């Protein structure tokens, strides 16, 4: 359980664009940044999948992400997931729980975030999910703040502009990379 979770506007935009691109599917990805005992700062994301997450594909993705993190002195700090069914937006699907369990066993300090609607009481559109016993449950106490150090523009305006410019078509997940290796699964060329 983390007392403080912050996410940059760029990382937040990428996560939402991934869910917008595959709005009829579940999507998931890895959160990158820095973590200590009491806080996590999410500075980037790596979109993973938008259809069934299969263990062999996940293993290959994790090997690549671990290498990328080592080479760039950045940490894996968590996992994000968006359900296919919006009516059940805050109850993680079974595969999301399995992936979160695996990462929770491997990472010292991690967060599990569900992508939701952006609302007044939830400006990031993210909800923290915590491990409670053997299950993952919504944490009503953790506030996820938006780190505006590099961009103080309102997240709603950023997402609106990105959607108007059809930026969701320019974000690629690891699954798309496996189908077409010319796709930039790190999304380094994506300008938001």
Swiss-Prot record:
Gene3D superfamilies: Cytidine Deaminase, domain 2. PROSITE patterns: MPN. One of its GO terms (cellular component) is EMC complex. Pfam families: UPF0172. It comes from the Eukaryota. CDD domains: MPN_UPF0172 (cd08060). Residues 5-135 form the MPN domain. PANTHER family: ER MEMBRANE PROTEIN COMPLEX, ER MEMBRANE PROTEIN COMPLEX SUBUNIT 8_9 HOMOLOG. Belongs to the EMC8/EMC9 family. This is ER membrane protein complex subunit 8/9 homolog.
């Amino acid at each position: 359980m983390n007392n403080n979770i912050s996410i940059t506007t760029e990382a937040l935009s990428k996560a939402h664009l991934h869910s917008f691109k595959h709005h009829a599917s579940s999507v998931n990805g890895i959160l990158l940044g820095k973590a200590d005992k009491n806080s996590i700062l999410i500075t980037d994301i790596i979109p993973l999948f938008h259809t069934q997450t299969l263990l062999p594909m996940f293993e290959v993705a994790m090997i690549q992400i671990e290498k990328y993190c080592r080479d760039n002195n950045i940490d894996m700090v968590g996992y994000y997931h968006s359900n296919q069914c919006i009516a059940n937006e805050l109850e993680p699907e079974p595969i999301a729980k399995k992936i979160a369990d695996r990462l929770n066993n491997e990472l010292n300090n991690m967060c599990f975030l569900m992508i939701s609607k952006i609302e007044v009481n939830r400006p990031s559109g993210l909800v923290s999910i915590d491990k409670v016993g053997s299950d993952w449950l919504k944490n009503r106490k953790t506030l996820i703040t938006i780190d505006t150090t590099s961009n103080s523009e309102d997240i709603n305006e950023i997402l609106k502009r990105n959607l108007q410019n059809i930026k969701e078509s320019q974000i690629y997940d690891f699954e798309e990379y496996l189908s077409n290796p010319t796709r930039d699964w790190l999304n380094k060329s994506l300008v938001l």
